Amino acid sequence: MTAITISDQEYRDFSRFLESQCGIVLGDSKQYLVRSRLSPLVAKFKLTSLSDLLRDVVTGRNRELRVAAVDAMTTNETLWFRDAYPFTVLAERLLPEVAANKRPIKIWSAASSSGQEPYSMAMTVLETQQRKPGMLPSVAITATDISASMLDMCKAGIYDNLALGRGLSPERRKIFFEDAGDGRMKIKDNVKRLVNFRPQNLMESYALLGKFDIIFCRNVLIYFSPDMKSKVLNQMASSLNPGGYLLLGASESLTGLTDKFEMVRCNPGIIYKLK
């Protein structure tokens, strides 16, 4: 029987490793999360215990295992049109405002997870184009994630009924999806064409991504240390075009982290504009 217990020292060593690799801070009491996320890898990599796995990850003995462990720890659940208001603001305020510049609109989904956020953006763009023909120039959405398995899922664009039921209306499901068999649905090509998926560690440089008019970095900063939050936010400020916008998660704030943005109150919600 595989041992799935870990010592306090093993947990601390792995926590330091994870923060150094991708900025995620586990804190003092997330042993249960490490066990639940990494235990399946013990059998997959033919190890005898979770302790052996953590040792090999921390020491770098097995690069493939390291990648798999980071992948497992950075995979998070998400929803279609999460919190609703960011997509309302995108449609009713941000897209029209940026469109007035008469140049292509560039949007970044900074932690795309399994694709619900960037595809929700793409659906919002298509709905706006239908509602206001000719208003929008071309729109390009870049969606990034650190997890290779999540990016593969994003690119496939195939979801089961459980995933589809989390925030997606029957109307949008009918318009933007097609049958993929086995009770699953696939994002239509006109939605997929708007989104380019690529790997990105938020601890590393964003320079190769280019500049954006709008950045969604929602429900990501909550996992980072204050120093890491500041680093990410200041890099994102440098990645925005003049007057660009940043949207955070409903429980996230810039207070004490950066002075490069001004808060803009919407109805509902709050967004941030580059100074």
From Swiss-Prot:
S-adenosyl-L-methionine binds at N76, T78, R82, E117, D145, N201, L202, R218, N219. Keywords: Methyltransferase, S-adenosyl-L-methionine, Transferase. The gene is cheR. It comes from Vibrio anguillarum (Listonella anguillarum). Pfam families: CheR, CheR_N. It comes from the Bacteria. Residues 1-275 form the CheR-type methyltransferase domain. Signal peptide: none annotated. One of its GO terms (biological process) is methylation. SMART domains: MeTrc. One of its GO terms (molecular function) is protein-glutamate O-methyltransferase activity. Its EC number is 2.1.1.80. Gene3D superfamilies: Chemotaxis receptor methyltransferase CheR, N-terminal domain, Vaccinia Virus protein VP39. Methylation of the membrane-bound methyl-accepting chemotaxis proteins (MCP) to form gamma-glutamyl methyl ester residues in MCP. This is Chemotaxis protein methyltransferase.
